[in-house]
Amino acid sequence: MSAALFCGPPPAVSFGCKDGRGRKGMVRSKDIVRQTVKPPAHACRLIGWNKYPGSVVPTNSSLSPSPTALDDDIELDLSPFLIIYKDGRIERLKGTTVIPACPEVATKDVIIDPATGVSVRLYLPNVVDLPSKKLPVLVYFHGGGFVIENTGSPNYHNYLTLLAAKSGLLIVSVNYRLAPEHPIPASFDDCMAGFNWVVSHSAGPAPEPWLARHGDLTQILISGDSAGGTVTHYVLLRADAGVIEGAALVHPYFLGSKRLENQTEEDFEFHEKLWRLSTPNTEGLDDPLINPLAPGAPSLAGLKCKRAVVFVAELDFLVERGRMYYDALVKSGWGGEAELVHQEGVGHVFHLSDYSGDVSVDMMAKMVAFLRGE
């Protein structure tokens, strides 16, 4: 893999968990961008929680706290994701940096719905040496707890560039609207729209020439990490039968009202608050959107794909939920092929910031093999 395939250097320092368990051991990279937006007046007034304790203190950061960012001004602190102030401002602490699409590596951005602003970023591998046959298409949904990240985030752009080069697939990454400005189900609807936009190229005139010329629309796969894994499950239940060849759920963001043994009380409460912030009208952590195993949730037997793989990480807060999902899928009567990949000694979405470690290399190899059907 040549470094020339990247639009800029891979991130040197990730903003994540050293041990994968929630927010413990957080550090901030020097190039972090703080994004503050002013939402509609009604956007955050339903929040009734006090300031969340245990805020993360920036380490090795060039940023100084805002003079207005006093504790008394804060409505809800969901560090390291975002802070909501009493005047309605929303400050995102990570996942706001955008790497532009690079023609040199065959990437480009396309707006698919001007009304909502939903767009996709396409990755076309090895343009000069493309084979005469068309390429399978992977529709990808990024993570970020539904409140941060985008298709231009450095970690996602670099990872998907590498994945496209290694797998030889044409990748379509969906840039969906974020909560709380756009409460769930907006993100789910946007991802479904992105998927349907790709599928639409198989019938009639195709609006996107890359998909028309190079995409094999008889071989569509979908994947997502964390919140994107949650969306992947959502799309699998709603796609037309026979359209999706395979699905890869990476460290899926599945929750539930019962705290599991591997989950600390602090992390459990944090993610409950994050979910309620994103989904004001939710039924709670047993909402079928976030808990596919909740009573009344659609049967996993209804997943619309031929094969599926679930990746879990030993030190991830979500590891047991991922394993439970896999076990339930196998027992559901679903007629496809299921695989579980359990990786030890690593935490949540470790592969987005470490491309050269042994476990990351192994994960990439397993992902590529799955996407290729090997």
UniProtKB/Swiss-Prot annotation:
Per the record, what are the reactions this protein catalyses?
6-tuliposide A = tulipalin A + D-glucose
Question: Which keywords does the record carry?
Answer: Amyloplast, Lyase, Plant defense, Plastid, Transit peptide
List the Pfam families hit by this protein, alphabetically: Abhydrolase_3
Q: Which GO terms of the molecular function aspect are on file?
A: hydrolase activity; lyase activity
User: Which EC number(s) does the record attach to this protein?
Assistant: 4.2.99.22
Q: Which domain of life is it from?
A: Eukaryota
One of the protein's GO biological processes: defense response
- Subcellular localization(s) per the UniProt record: Plastid, Amyloplast
Concerning InterPro entries, the annotation shows: AB_hydrolase_3, AB_hydrolase_fold, Carboxylest/Gibb_receptor
Active site: which residues? 226, 316, 348
Point out the transit peptide region: 1-68
GO cellular component terms attached to this protein's record = amyloplast
Expression across tissues is: Highly expressed in pistil and bulb scales. Lower expression in stem, and barely detected in root, leaf, petal and stamen.
Record family assignment: Belongs to the AB hydrolase superfamily.
The record ties this protein, via PANTHER family, to:
ARYLACETAMIDE DEACETYLASE (PTHR23024), CARBOXYLESTERASE 2-RELATED (PTHR23024:SF577)
| Subunit field text | Homodimer.
Its biological purpose is as follows: Lactone-forming carboxylesterases, specifically catalyzing intramolecular transesterification, but not hydrolysis. Involved in the biosynthesis of tulipalins, defensive chemicals that show antimicrobial activities against a broad range of strains of bacteria and fungi. Substrates are 6-tuliposide A > 6-tuliposide B.
Q: What else is known?
A: 6-tuliposide A and tuliposide A-converting enzyme, which are compartmentalized in the vacuoles and plastids respectively, come into contact with each other for the enzyme reaction releasing toxic tulipalin A upon cell disruption by pathogen infection or herbivore predation.
Q: What is this protein called?
A: Tuliposide A-converting enzyme b3, amyloplastic
**Species of the source:** Tulipa gesneriana
